[in-house]
Amino acid sequence: MQNLKNTTKEQKEILSNAESILYTCKNDLGNFIESEVIKSNGKYYRLQATNKHITEFTEV
């Protein structure tokens, strides 16, 4: 995912070093819901964003 809004400094650092493992995107009545699993510094993270606004950012 690129150009995400409302990211923290820590999230930006994780995203800058991340490798995408799985990415999906769906259009739900005009809302673009993106989901992605990334790997950064040996840790895995699950992200979800709606219209480029992060709704979930968790380590798995």
PLM feature segments, named:
Residues 17-60:
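Acidic, low-complexity, intrinsically disordered interaction modules
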Residues 2-12:
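Mixed-charge, Lys/Arg-rich low-complexity intrinsically disordered regions
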